Amino acid sequence: MSEPIKLHDLRPAKGANKPKTRVGRGEASKGKTAGRGTKGTKARKQVSAAFEGGQMPIHMRLPKLKGFKNPNKVTYQVVNVADLQKHFENGGNVTIADLVSAGLVRAKQPVKVLGDGEITASVNITATKFSASAKQKIEAAGGSVTETK
């Protein structure tokens, strides 16, 4: 009975691993044109991957983008009055820290309260910004709004 094959005994089959042919190293071994054929751009240099063979390139066919990206754009996290009703139905004072602990917003980012939904709880809320409808609904429910910077 022969011994089992072990990992360190494995070798590639004879002729399976051929050395890479080094071209352009003399006339006898793929010298001169080195497998590139004769003449033309591809024989002389590397053609750019973006080259489309004389067709108008894609970056020139597409329209230019208008406008710019405003570096001073402020993106607000949104909280609706329906969320306030759901999480703070007893009313009271609500700050951004309370909204963070309730899982409605993330810390260190501005918060805007919008007027989607209904609110009956009397909340005194402090946030970065309020929409006009949110202010109206909160004040109609007996609460107050305070805008921070």
From Swiss-Prot:
Please list the disulfide bridges: none
An example molecular function term from Gene Ontology annotations = structural constituent of ribosome
Q: Which domain of life is it from?
A: Bacteria
Q: Which key words tag this protein in UniProt?
A: Ribonucleoprotein, Ribosomal protein, RNA-binding, rRNA-binding
Q: Which Pfam families match?
A: Ribosomal_L27A
Q: Name one GO cellular component term.
A: cytosolic large ribosomal subunit
Ranges where the record places region Disordered? 1-55
Where does the record place Basic and acidic residues bias? 1-12
Q: Name one GO biological process term.
A: translation
Q: Family, per the entry? A: Belongs to the universal ribosomal protein uL15 family.
Quaternary structure annotation from Swiss-Prot or TrEMBL: Part of the 50S ribosomal subunit.
> What is the role of this chain?
Binds to the 23S rRNA.
HAMAP family named in the record? Ribosomal_uL15
Q: What is this protein called?
A: Large ribosomal subunit protein uL15
Q: Which organism is it from?
A: Corynebacterium kroppenstedtii (strain DSM 44385 / JCM 11950 / CIP 105744 / CCUG 35717)
Gene for this protein? Answer: rplO
